[in-house]
Amino acid sequence: TLDDVRRLPFSDVADLRDGYPLPLLCVEPSEVVRVHASSGTTGKRKILAYTQKDVDTFALQMARCYELAGLTTEDRMQIAVGYGLWTAGAGFQLGSERFGALTIPVGPGNIDMQLQLLVDLQTTCIGCTSSMALLLAEEVERHNLRDKIALKKIIFGSEPHSLKMRQSFTEKLGLEASYDIAGMTEMYGPGTGLNCEVGEGIHYWADLFYIEIIDPHTLQPVPEGEVGEMVVTSLSKEAVPLIRYRTHDLSRLIPEPCPCGRAIPRHGHIRGRSDDMIIFRGVNIYPGQIADVLNLYPDVGGEYH
């Protein structure tokens, strides 16, 4: 059963760095059709190999996110995230093309081009970071473009954001909805899950990933619904099928059914990193908990360090 997974050892970022440049490869090198990498804060980059089936699954999980966000083939998807070794641009584009939306692969930055294409191509959805979304909202407001664009939705991710920050760009752009997308290079890239219109937690693809939540100190499972470190096992990846990979991201599994009615399981939004935790008077404190308190005060802005 899936409970037997707990008998297997953990894997970690060190396993990927130790096997550089193509770590933990489980197929013949001739079967690898592409690589992606994450930017390492120290040492060498983590390079992950992909077979053609892996690329197809990457496209599938992103296409599912577009469907969950309520997009149709009539939508126009502007991609304003990084390309190259980073997975984001490739994933957003693969998913958009598989889904069947008109794809506009702009890349990050170049705010003038972003604004021009929003107007000229009547983009209905854009994929970007939360900080880029806020910048776009401010520039649209500054140039009085709100009545000239058709933007309805934003799918954002890859960096922390506050609730107030999200509310700010949603209101400034007059969006119908904004969606927080989850992902990590070790599990294809973006698209491992997305929040629904209810917005509580992230629906994730349980046929592609098995998620455990553990105590980062004891390495034992936490009680149901409690916050701990997310550990992910790939159920479909061919080239580098990571088993019990310690993400060091803090989250929780949400046991209750989602009010949206979907049977897709959920995990909570990422609350921080297990290595960011501090212990104050015997209590574990995480950055996400401090952010939750700050969000209770209307006079506190959405951008802080």
Name the predicted role of every residue range.
Residues 32, 55, 82-84, 131-132:
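Short glycine-enriched loops at secondary-structure junctions
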Residues 35, 62, 93, 166, ...:
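Generic structural marker for isolated residues within well-ordered, non-membrane alpha-helices
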Residues 1-37, 42-60, 64-68, 72-74, ...:
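Nucleotide 5′-phosphate-binding alpha/beta core
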Residues 64-67, 94, 138-142:
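Short, well-ordered alpha-helices that flank and scaffold nucleotide-derived cofactor binding pockets
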